[in-house]
Structures are given as C-alpha cells and as structure tokens.
C-alpha cells in the first residue's frame, strides 16, 4: 500500500531516527498515535505479528529519540515487538511486505538494516549479545551505548539469567529494558513509580549513591547499614530485588505508554555506569481493543478487517497436524493416567489447548525453557511416567545436549512430538525446521519416524508412546493434513517401510509428508514408490532390495540433505558395497528465506514439477 501523508502527517516527517530527533518533544504523543494507527492499517492488510508491536510504540519512539541510533546499539529480543522500530528506521513504506517473499524480514535482521544490530527470531539472546557488544564498545572507546529490550516471557529463559549473572560480574555499561506486558498498571502505583524512577535514575541520587559507597566503603558496619537502608527504601515500592542481587541497578516499574516519562527516565539512565535495568509496564495490543482483550489470538494475524475487530475464521477444511497431535494426546490421556505432556510456552501452536483444559494436572508449560523441558521429561520417565514433549523442530535445537545426555544415554522412554518440521514459511531462516533429522539421526538408540499423512502420524505417535527401550521422535509439518481416513490405532513394526507403488528402473524412497508429490512423480515416471516411515532404524533390507531391483534410487525428504535421511540410505548402500546411483533430494545447504510454504517448495524444486525435473536432469 502507498503511504498516506494526509492520514499520518507527523509520521510522514520521520523516515529515519535523525528526522525523529528533530521533532519537538511535544509532538511525540501525536507521533505515537499515528504510528500505532499505521501499524494497525499495515498489518491488517498484509498479516504479521501484531499485538506485541502495538505495546511497544512509546518505548520505540523514546529509545530512538534519546539514543543516537544506529551509532548507539539497540537490540531487540525475539523481534515480534520490533515492527514500530522498522517503521521508524527507513522501512516505513515497505512494512506492508513484511513476512512475504522478497519483503521485509519478520524479525530484526542484520542484512536488512544497520539499525538491526542482532538478527533474532528465537528468544532470550539479547542480553548475552548485548554484553559482548557493550564490551566491544568499551574497548572501542567511542562512547557508544548498548540497550537490550527483552519481554517478560523471554526473560524467563535460563540463557537470559546466565547473561545477567555474567553482566553483574564484569559490569559492562549497558541498559536492559524489561518490557512487562503481563501486569496492569493501576494509576496510583504507576504514578508513584514513574516519579520514583525519575528520582532514582537522576544524577543527584546516582552521585549520592556512588559517593556514599566510596566514602564509607572502608567502614563495614556503615556500608552494610547504607545497603540495607537503600534496599529498604527501594524495596517498599520496587520489585527489583532479584535484578539488584544479579548486580544491576534496578529502576521501575514505570508506565511504558508514557512517552514523555520514558524519555525523561532514559535520558537520566543514559550516562549511568555499569549494568542498568529498567522495568516498564505495557499492555499488549495497546490502542486496539480487540487485541487488548485477546492478545494471544492477536499475537500474529492474517489479513483482517480492523473495523470488525474479528479475525477471519478458518474455512473449516482439513485439520492441521497440530490438531491431529492434540486429538491423539487427549485420546491417549483418557486411557492412560501415566501420560504427561510438556511444552516450552507453545500451548496454542502445538495443539495442546484442549489437553491443558481436560488434564490440567498432567499438563506442564515450562515457559521458554527448552533445556529444562527435556530434562524435566527425563525425570518424569525415571519416575515411571510417560512424558510427551511437544516442541517445534527449530526450538528442539536449543536442547540438543539434554536429548543426548539426559534422555538417550539413559535410554529413557521420552517421546518428542516435533511440530513445524521442514519448511515453515513466513517466519524465515530462524524458524525453518530443516535440521532435526540430521541432528537426531546420529544419536544412538533413537527411533525417528516420518509420517506421510495424518493417519500414519497418529499410528506413529501411538507406536512411539508405547516404545519403552529409549527415546522416540515423530516429526510432522506445519499446515493442514491430507484428508485420509483415520484407522484404529495400532503399533507399527519398528524400522519397517512400505512399498506403495511398483514401477520399473527407478525407485523413490520417500520420508515424510512430501508423499503426495512423490506419488505424482512416481506415476509420471513409472517409478516404484516407497514410504520409508522410519529414518532410524532404517529398513536396510528394503533399501537393499530396492537397490537390487532398480537401476537408480531417489531419496526425498523435507530436511537438510546433509546428514539427513538420504545420507542414511547412502551409508547403508556403501556399507553393503552396493554402488547403485542415488539422487538425494531435500533442503539445500543454505538458510531458507521467508515466503509461503508453497513458494519455498516451488523455488527449491520440492513440488511435483520440481522433483520430476530434478530426476530427469539427473538421469539425462
């Protein structure tokens, strides 16, 4: 869409932070209002992350107004809340392309703008990177400031606390801003803390605080009295004891929607030495009532009519694989009281809402703590329960050591339900599920299953759940299932594939939900088609049989070619000295950018036409 200058006259004056800092301070509330309306107008037309950005409008304006960005370095954690940042940093007229093929990246991205200091997408990385950036800035000696913005969800992760603990030790000059949108600000508490924040961040308090410490540092009783007095004064109104104990100077909480107050506080804090912590209170979805009332639903939105306040309902078509998993989970839990389900803060995305309501005592949302989720599951298994860890492929990467050390080595019966495997789409490089087969396949005693449709997915979940000799994994994609009939649950024979079509000369060994495309290609080329089902253990007998009966083999998977299922087939053939030609088709050796799943598959040659073309070119 084209930018409407008449509709946004103040925002029209700002196409860079340099222009923002030229605006008179009294015009900033109007700028915030226009920025919020423009965000609503843009995202409702294009889709994207929504509620988080509405909540950070005033903070974004204040940060870029006070700090000399991009010289001063501003780091956003995760990046869901960074749409206003993109709008104010030269990307205003392109915001309608966000998350689209060739458009703006959904998260801060170093290759897109000098204002995007750190490429993000996964949570809780900002403080660690910020410490490194602050240390580098100190060695550079150019008086460059470092600011990290992290949400109340992301700060619960262990990595954030590891970073804060380190910052308290080496004491770099940096500011961490906690964007807390879980609590409401009552007028009296908000006003009191806004005033307190400006006092506590001011030069008078800072100089008295530091000066007093220096003067009385040699007198232990007085030093301790000063410390206790300061803690008592701040502790009466400030919930910052934890952050103070980690070595930060805590300020807040303050109203994150008072742009003038934020500017005053940030100006006071800008020159403070050592690690600083500013706690701001915001409302997710601020300024758009439907999003304020239901920020989870409005976290990420499709195109919608903002005047209606409603998101378009699904067409009522085929269920998604997440729902297939959620239905299986509820069905199994109703029959087996030993089932325990775990998610690292992905209840809605993983299809676990119904389970959490029906079985609240067996549902564990461990927050953004993937490492803990896996080892917690290990403990449940040791205790005689049957844990199911529902996790996105891209987030399981964060718990790799726990999968090996705490689960696999001990042969514990933990089942991993790996959602969003393969190409995910609009969230781009940071969220593609490209690597799980590669990084799990090398783990001893791991059973890995790749269903070709929703019925097989259910059977594999059932099989994995009842496997007691070690960990299992079932990986399935984002998106709708295929509409096949669901049959009664039964255990599949471990490590056995299934021939779906008999052909001549060429055999296609398919792993996973590219099966419909593989079937079209097999029909066109009169090839044999095999549903391999298991990546580990592989069906060696079937692979060798296909090699003996055909001139060439093709492996097909929606995972990185390097180290994936196709690599396993190659290893089997080499181990048995069978020099049959093999073409491995899968995800190439680069990070796959954003776009729809269909666009990505077409570009990568993973639709039926692309697969057929690859095979014909290879055979020519």
Curated annotation (Swiss-Prot):
GO terms for biological process: 1-deoxy-D-xylulose 5-phosphate biosynthetic process; isopentenyl diphosphate biosynthetic process, methylerythritol 4-phosphate pathway; terpenoid biosynthetic process; thiamine biosynthetic process. Binds 1 Mg(2+) ion per subunit. Coiled coil: none annotated. Transmembrane segments: none annotated. Thiamine diphosphate binds at residues 80, 121-123, 153-154, 181, 288, 370. GO terms for molecular function: 1-deoxy-D-xylulose-5-phosphate synthase activity; magnesium ion binding; thiamine pyrophosphate binding. Pathway: Metabolic intermediate biosynthesis; 1-deoxy-D-xylulose 5-phosphate biosynthesis; 1-deoxy-D-xylulose 5-phosphate from D-glyceraldehyde 3-phosphate and pyruvate: step 1/1. Keywords: Isoprene biosynthesis, Magnesium, Metal-binding, Thiamine biosynthesis, Thiamine pyrophosphate, Transferase. Its EC number is 2.2.1.7. The keyword Electron transport does not apply. It catalyses: D-glyceraldehyde 3-phosphate + pyruvate + H(+) = 1-deoxy-D-xylulose 5-phosphate + CO2. CDD domains: TPP_DXS (cd02007), TPP_PYR_DXS_TK_like (cd07033). GO terms for cellular component: cytosol. The keyword Transferase applies. Its cofactor is Mg(2+); thiamine diphosphate. Mg(2+) binds at residues 152, 181. It holds the Pfam family Transketolase_C. Homodimer. Belongs to the transketolase family. DXPS subfamily. This is 1-deoxy-D-xylulose-5-phosphate synthase. It comes from Salmonella typhimurium (strain LT2 / SGSC1412 / ATCC 700720). The lineage of its organism: Bacteria, Pseudomonadati, Pseudomonadota, Gammaproteobacteria, Enterobacterales.
């Amino acid at each position: 869409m084209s930018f409407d200058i008449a509709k946004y006259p103040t925002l029209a004056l700002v196409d860079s932070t340099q222009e923002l800092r030229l605006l008179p301070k009294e015009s900033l509330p109007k700028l915030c209002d226009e920025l919020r309306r423009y965000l609503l107008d843009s995202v409702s037309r294009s889709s994207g992350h929504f509620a988080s950005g509405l909540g950070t409008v005033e903070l974004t304006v204040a940060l870029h107004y006070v700090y000399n960005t991009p010289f001063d370095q501003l780091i956003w954690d995760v990046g869901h809340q960074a749409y206003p940042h993109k709008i104010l940093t030269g990307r205003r007229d392109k915001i309608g392309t966000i998350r689209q093929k060739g458009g703006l990246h959904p998260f801060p991205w170093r290759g897109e703008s000098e204002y995007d200091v750190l490429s993000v997408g996964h949570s809780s990385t900002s403080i660690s990177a910020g410490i490194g950036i602050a240390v580098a800035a100190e060695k550079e000696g150019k008086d460059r400031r470092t600011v990290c913005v992290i949400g109340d969800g992301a700060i619960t992760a262990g990595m954030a606390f590891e970073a804060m603990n380190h910052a308290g030790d080496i004491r770099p000059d940096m500011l961490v801003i906690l964007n807390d949108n879980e609590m409401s600000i009552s007028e009296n508490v908000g006003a009191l803390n806004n005033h307190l924040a400006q006092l506590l961040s001011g030069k008078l308090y800072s100089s008295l605080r530091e000066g007093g410490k220096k003067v009385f540092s040699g007198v232990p009783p007085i030093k301790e009295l000063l410390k206790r007095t300061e803690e008592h004064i701040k502790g009466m109104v400030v919930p910052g004891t934890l952050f103070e104990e980690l070595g930060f100077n805590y300020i807040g909480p303050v109203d994150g929607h008072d742009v003038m107050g934020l500017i005053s506080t940030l100006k006071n804090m800008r020159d403070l030495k050592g690690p600083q912590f500013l706690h701001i209170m915001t409302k997710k979805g601020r300024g758009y009532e439907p999003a304020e009332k239901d920020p989870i639903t409005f976290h990420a939105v499709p195109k919608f009519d903002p005047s209606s306040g409603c998101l378009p309902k699904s067409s009522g078509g085929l269920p998604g694989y997440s729902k297939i998993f959620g239905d299986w989970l509820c069905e199994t839990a109703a029959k087996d009281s030993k089932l325990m389900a775990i998610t690292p803060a992905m209840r809605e995305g993983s299809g676990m809402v119904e389970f959490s309501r029906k079985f609240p005592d067996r549902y564990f949302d461990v927050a953004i703590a993937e490492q803990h989720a896996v080892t917690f599951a290990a403990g449940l298994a040791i205790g005689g329960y049957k844990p199911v860890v529902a996790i996105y492929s891209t987030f399981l990467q964060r718990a790799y050591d726990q999968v090996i050390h705490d689960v696999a080595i001990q042969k514990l019966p933990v089942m991993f339900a790996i959602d969003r495997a393969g190409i995910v789409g609009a969230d781009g490089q940071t969220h593609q599920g490209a690597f799980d087969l590669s990084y799990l396949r090398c783990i001893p005693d791991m059973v890995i299953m790749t269903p070709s449709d929703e019925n097989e997915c259910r059977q594999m979940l059932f099989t994995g759940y009842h496997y007691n000799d070690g960990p299992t994994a079932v990986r399935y994609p984002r998106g709708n299932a295929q509409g096949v009939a669901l049959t009664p649950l039964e255990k599949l024979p471990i490590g056995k594939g299934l021939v779906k079509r008999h052909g001549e000369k060429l055999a296609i060994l398919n792993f996973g939900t590219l099966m419909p495309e593989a079937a079209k290609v097999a029909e066109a080329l009169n090839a044999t088609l095999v549903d391999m089902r298991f990546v580990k253990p592989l069906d060696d007998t079937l692979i060798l049989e296909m090699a003996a009966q055909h001139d060439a083999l093709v492996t097909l998977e929606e995972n990185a070619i390097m180290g994936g299922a196709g690599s396993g087939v190659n290893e089997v053939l080499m181990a048995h000295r069978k020099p049959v030609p093999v073409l491995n088709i899968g995800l190439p050796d680069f990070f796959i950018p954003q776009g729809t799943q269909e666009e990505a598959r077409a570009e990568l040659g993973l639709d039926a036409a692309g697969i057929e073309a690859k095979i014909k070119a290879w055979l020519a």
